[in-house]
């Protein structure tokens, strides 16, 4: 057996192993009638992106599940791909062209799209290469792109089919408009942020001034597009003037007073201005009351020709000037400070303007019902379950989805218009002439919302609309792993399309994880400068360390706080594991490792095998229930504490002994526990586990194709394991005395254990272990305290009370002096912390984090003082 290097080199190992894995096709999956399929489709990252910490947690969780299922005997497919990301990519290319002094309108659509494809080919694969650095075991042979030929064919077919069913239509409706990106946005693409503004109260007078109505608005610039004032039909204050008119201040245009139940008569004056072209609720009132629609904003956020003297001003310039003019006219009643949610573009964060525009829409109500039912029935479940409420809330209140975008990069809408008769033709292949009049046709200029194509991702990537063996075998997929921030954008739409197109659920489980935040709990962002580059972390600490820190810190659905200390702890774990494996392999040497002989097991062996069984059962259950953080933490605790700190130390005396049969059995146990531990750890730390596994005797060609561990009934020793835990508890108590009384490790203890019955017998069999790990030269067991010398300290453990004479081990007077000095220092610390916390000025002004730290320091100091005083009391009684 070749000797392992003294230290683990993650950089050399990771590059070497990944190349080998990919070359040997270990990630590849094929339809296999002898195996059950398990499929995950990757949430396709944008081609504009590069690996960030959000990707890292997302892909780590998916990879852990895939590796677990692969080892559990499934034909596990993790299907990768990238998203064309219409707006994000187009913005990038426009920015690049702007540096060259080029406008996209100057070069035309074809030349722009050539640039876009060139950009995609140059930069689009960057994030895929970075995913490999993370250890992602995707089936790269099946990599897809949302605008590749197959996906594009699926998109066109679905559009045409939905159009034929009347579920896609074109019409003038209120939409969300980004004046910066100059495109429509769906409701899900609008982010809301609290902004402090004002509420302007404006009076509208009757033409003859005989009556008036006051309304309040947060957007006075929309007054230019008002077409009515609405009141509630049951509001007696306005019964006499419904149907009459008022004059828009400054503008001078008469508008009617209408009655509509949308108005809350208890709110404000009970009257609202209606601007159907620039507010979604007003648009609905306008439809019910047959009001005209006056759009007064241009696509780039200026006032158009209907704005009269305000034409050409930006919306903000118009607001300022119009308010001044209304005040001058005497119609401004008052201005109040007002905080409200303002819609912003999810991509560029510009303020979104609601306005009426001719767009393409998907009628969502009929599509939403089966998508709701499939979750309610339990066919699709959310993990954690609470996120199904988020899903229901969105789906039950869903509005029609605006799917057209005024962009060039994306799936062009397959609609064609006749230049002569105006006929609209929607078809999968472009018709040459108008079927109605034979006239010339031109295609719709708009492209589809990116989420329209990614909503078909689970089945378009498997070959639909063709009937493929992959689609038949791997669909429906098994698990979707994603963040809670795209439940509306993506999850809901995949369920909608799955039920409508495939008449099947797209997946069985939606596993939701939270966001990765910084150590203060803040969202990571460029503006805060608190972002973390996963590639830098991988370079410094290794992919395994990053992956493990992300999994252990992330409970399902909850946000996690991330910092390099967690990665350092994971790196330390790698080193601990490596050193343990090196010890095991050095002790195995070239010896043959056979099966474990259960007839030769002692109590320590039975304990570790029992614990291994427990770990296998619990970790398997955790993986199946998506409690990946618990699974990772359990294997960490088992390997670090029970295997490395305890069993290896318990094994050393026997490995150094002369009983060859016993040594062979201990070698077999060490090998088996290490091998199964590596397998349990592999989904989270694929590189180091593979590197160590391949050094073990009887290893297969790769750990990822080896079988997931199974518990063995013959290794269940609950009683012996309980006894061993009591022995370990006793050793820990003795070590605490040694540490607290400052007894050097070189000084051997003489111990008397007071216990009786079966425990005495069990402890007697464990005396060699107690002597070795407690640092004792003599251990006696007796039934009572008779004959215990006075100059002893005691430690109470579950199995026994340990009495240790100290007079021969330490200078009692010096130790008493040392403890007194330490106690005085701790008292001083307590006084200082108490003083701060009792100071009202400190508590009022200090940050909560600082106050919490001070309370923590005080509690720790008080605990330490109790321990010191207890030890002093023992010394004083000697």
Q: Can you name each region flagged by the protein language model?
A:
Residues 34-42, 64, 101-103, 128-135, ...:
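Active-site-adjacent bridging/hinge elements
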Residues 41-47, 375-385, 470-477, 558-559, ...:
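Short glycine/proline-rich turn/loop motifs
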Residues 54-66, 82-83, 151-154, 212-327, ...:
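Structured ligand/cofactor/substrate-binding pocket environments in proteins
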């Amino acid at each position: 057996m070749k000797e392992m290097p003294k230290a683990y080199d993650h950089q050399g190992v990771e590059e070497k192993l990944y190349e080998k894995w990919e070359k040997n096709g270990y990630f590849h999956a094929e339809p296999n009638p002898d195996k059950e399929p398990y499929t995950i489709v990757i949430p396709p990252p944008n081609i504009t992106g590069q690996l960030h910490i959000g990707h890292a947690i997302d892909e780590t969780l998916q990879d852990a599940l895939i590796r677990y299922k692969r080892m559990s005997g499934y034909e596990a497919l993790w299907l990768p791909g990238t998203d064309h990301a219409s707006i994000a990519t187009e913005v990038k290319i426009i920015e690049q062209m702007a540096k060259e002094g080029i406008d996209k309108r100057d070069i035309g659509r074809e030349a722009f799209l050539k640039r876009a494809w060139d950009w995609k080919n140059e930069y689009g694969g960057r994030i895929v290469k970075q995913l490999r650095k993370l250890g992602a075991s995707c089936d790269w042979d099946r990599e897809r792109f949302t605008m590749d030929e197959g996906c594009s064919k699926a998109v066109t077919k679905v559009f045409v089919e939905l159009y034929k069913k009347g579920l896609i239509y074109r019409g003038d409706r209120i939409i969300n408009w980004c004046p910066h990106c100059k495109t429509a946005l769906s409701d899900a693409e609008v982010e809301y942020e609290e902004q402090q503004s004002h509420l302007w109260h404006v009076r509208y007078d009757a033409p003859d001034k005989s009556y008036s109505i006051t309304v309040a608005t947060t957007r006075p610039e929309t007054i230019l597009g008002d077409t009515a004032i609405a009141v509630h039909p049951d509001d007696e204050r306005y019964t006499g003037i419904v149907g009459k008119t008022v004059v828009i201040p400054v503008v001078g245009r008469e508008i009617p007073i209408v009655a509509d139940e949308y108005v809350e008569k208890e709110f404000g004056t009970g009257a609202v201005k209606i601007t159907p072209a620039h507010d979604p609720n007003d648009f609905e009132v306008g439809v019910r009351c047959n009001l005209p629609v006056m759009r007064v904003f241009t696509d780039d956020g200026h006032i158009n020709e209907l704005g009269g003297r305000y034409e050409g001003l930006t919306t903000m310039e118009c607001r300022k000037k119009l308010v001044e003019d209304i005040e001058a006219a005497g119609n401004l009643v008052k201005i109040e400070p007002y905080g409200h949610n303002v819609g912003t573009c999810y991509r560029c964060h510009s303020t979104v303007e609601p306005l009426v525009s001719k767009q393409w829409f998907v009628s969502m109500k009929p599509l939403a019902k089966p998508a709701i039912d499939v979750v309610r029935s339990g066919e699709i479940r959310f993990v954690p379950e609470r996120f199904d409420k988020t899903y229901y809330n969105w789906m039950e209140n869903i509005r029609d989805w605006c799917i057209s975008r005024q962009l060039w990069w994306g799936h062009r809408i397959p609609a064609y218009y006749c230049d002569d008769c105006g006929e609209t033709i929607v078809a999968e292949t472009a018709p040459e002439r108008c079927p109605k009049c034979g006239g010339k046709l031109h295609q719709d200029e708009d492209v589809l919302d990116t989420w329209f194509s990614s909503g078909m991702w689970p089945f378009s990537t498997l070959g639909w609309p063709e009937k493929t063996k992959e689609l038949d075998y791997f669909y429906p997929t098994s698990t979707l792993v994603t963040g809670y921030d795209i439940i509306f954008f993506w999850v809901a739409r995949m369920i909608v399309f799955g039920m409508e197109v495939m008449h099947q659920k797209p997946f069985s489980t939606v596993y939701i994880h939270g966001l990765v935040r910084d150590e203060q709990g803040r969202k990571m962002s460029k503006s805060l400068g608190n972002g973390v580059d996963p590639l830098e972390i991988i370079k410094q600490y290794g992919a395994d360390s990053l992956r493990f820190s992300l999994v252990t810190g992330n409970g399902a659905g909850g946000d996690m706080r991330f910092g390099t200390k967690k990665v350092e702890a994971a790196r330390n774990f790698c080193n601990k594991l490596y050193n343990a494996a090196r010890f095991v392999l050095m002790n195995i040497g070239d010896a043959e490792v056979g099966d474990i002989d259960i007839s030769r097991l002692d109590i320590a062996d039975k304990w570790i095998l029992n614990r291994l069984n427990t770990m296998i059962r619990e970790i398997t259950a955790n993986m199946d229930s998506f409690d990946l953080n618990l699974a990772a933490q359990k294997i960490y605790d088992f390997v670090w504490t029970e295997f490395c700190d305890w069993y290896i130390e318990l094994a050393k005396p026997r490995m150094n002994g002369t009983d060859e049969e016993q040594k062979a059995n201990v070698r077999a146990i060490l090998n088996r526990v290490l091998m199964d531990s590596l397998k349990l750890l592999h989904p989270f730390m694929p590189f180091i586990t593979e590197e160590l596994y391949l050094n073990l005797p009887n290893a297969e060609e790769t750990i990822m194709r080896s079988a997931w561990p199974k518990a063995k009934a013959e290794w269940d020793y609950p009683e012996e394991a309980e006894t061993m835990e009591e022995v370990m508890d006793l050793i820990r108590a003795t070590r605490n005395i040694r540490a607290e009384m400052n007894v050097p490790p070189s000084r051997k203890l003489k111990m008397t254990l007071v216990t009786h019955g079966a425990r005495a017998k069990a402890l007697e069999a464990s005396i060699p272990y107690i002597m070795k790990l407690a640092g004792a030269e003599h251990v006696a067991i007796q039934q009572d305290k008779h004959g215990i010398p006075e100059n002893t300290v005691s430690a109470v453990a579950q199995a026994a009370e340990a009495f240790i004479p100290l007079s021969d081990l330490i200078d009692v007077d010096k130790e008493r002096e040392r403890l007194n000095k330490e106690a005085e220092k701790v008292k001083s610390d307590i006084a200082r912390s108490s003083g701060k916390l009792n100071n009202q000025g400190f508590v009022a002004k200090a940050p909560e984090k600082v106050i919490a730290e001070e309370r923590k320091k005080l509690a720790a100091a008080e605990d330490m003082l109790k321990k010191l005083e207890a030890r002093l009391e023992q010394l004083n009684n000697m």
